[in-house]
Amino acid sequence: MKRNQRLLSLLPASLLVIAAFAGCTDETIIYRDRPLYEEPLETALGFVGYTSTDSKLVVCGNCHVSAQAQWDSTAHAGAWNTLQASPGAQAFCEGCHTVSDLGNAVSEPAGHSATGEERYYDVQCESCHGAGLAHVEDPNKNTVPLAMMNVGDVLGDAGTGCAECHTGDHHPFAEEWAASGHGTVNAYPAGRDGCENCHTGEGALDMFGVQTNYTEKADLGEDGQHMAITCAVCHDPHGSDNGAQLRFPIDAPSEELNLCIQCHQKRGRPDPTTFR
């Protein structure tokens, strides 16, 4: 009986101690966004690469969600694994299967070529657009890294966009393009109203309804300058539902929906002396 009384007498004191400790454990939950990117090494020259290599979330994709989703379905998104699975893989191939100085305006080792880091695996946004760090730190229209549309002199120009990788004995697409009618601009039709849609790259993009910006755009039209029908005029670099990332299918029985026929359809009967 005395023991029970002693326990009861201690109960108020115990409750006071518990209340005091409860007051000391008051918590405020602070939510923090995850970091959008890891600060790149100085030698990477401003290339940021992946936020998460495992999930293949590019830093750019944190904001440009639809572009990330399109890119996910392209061969560029799996370029590193494609190389590793090839029995002919060589170290010198890595620059075209990663974010590096190839495919953009950078002229010295950058990204994977400079650091060897996994965050630069695959052909990501920056492979064509160039370093994105400045835009990530200060996202405004003046810091947007623009991709190149021109292919230029594929045999000698070091800054030739797509042609820096899609070239050579392995896949001579740039050489084939340069030898085709698409590789040159015929000044006469290019400068005529009604002809520019099929004789200039900028005109074709406008006809296709593509509203975009690129490095050369500001200079086009000045002093008769026009862009040829380059790779990205017919192929969507961000991806598409058509084969080879084409902007339109090539088997649609429609002048409005067939990529080639939108231009190559102006004669009543075939003429082997002209591309049209």
Model-derived segments and spans:
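Enrichment for repetitive, rod-forming helical segments
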Residues: 12-13, 245
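C-terminal motif of bacterial Sec signal peptides marking the signal peptidase cleavage site
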Residues: 19-23
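Short sequence/structural segments immediately N-terminal
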Residues: 24-276
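Bacterial N-terminal signal peptides that target proteins for export
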Residues: 2-11
